Amino acid sequence: MNKLKIVNQEELKDWAEEIFKKNSFNMVDVSSKKETFRRALASGKIYVGKEVFDLIKNKKMPKGDPISLAEVSAVLGVKKTSELIPLCHPLPIDHTATKIVMNEVDRSLEVFCVVSAFAKTGVEMEAIMGVNAALITIYDLSKIVNPNLKIDNVKLLIKEGGKSGLWKNPDGLPKFLENIF
């Protein structure tokens, strides 16, 4: 039978460091940070091919309108981020919006998701998760027509807030987004 051992403060500190910091995953401690306005914009693309593109454009997809459902999925993705990515903090999301742009040239749909919150940590992962949820929903509704779909180029475009301030993707932004933040 193990007996309880009384330890001093120094031994307790060593024990806590051993248990909680070495060889384990830990959520970043944001308890001492102040809440500030945070915003992020992410994007991603799905190439669907001519047949699927035309069906979406003409609102004749067999399982319904992928664009409308993808916009709803993006909201759910944003809200569920901390449940799906283990070390993400649950955040009080103040706003999210999704825009899906159809590109007839390469037969793709590009998803843009913006998220904002007044929080202690950024909303980049929430924006990226919103994009991914929308893209996967489009994939799900389109695969019945053509399973040869390609999700590509999911990335953070802009983040704002916190001590690092404003960051814009060095690869540049689409022209219509250059002055968004």
Predicted regions and their residues:
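C-terminal binding/interaction regions
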Residues: N2-I67, V72-H89, H95-F181
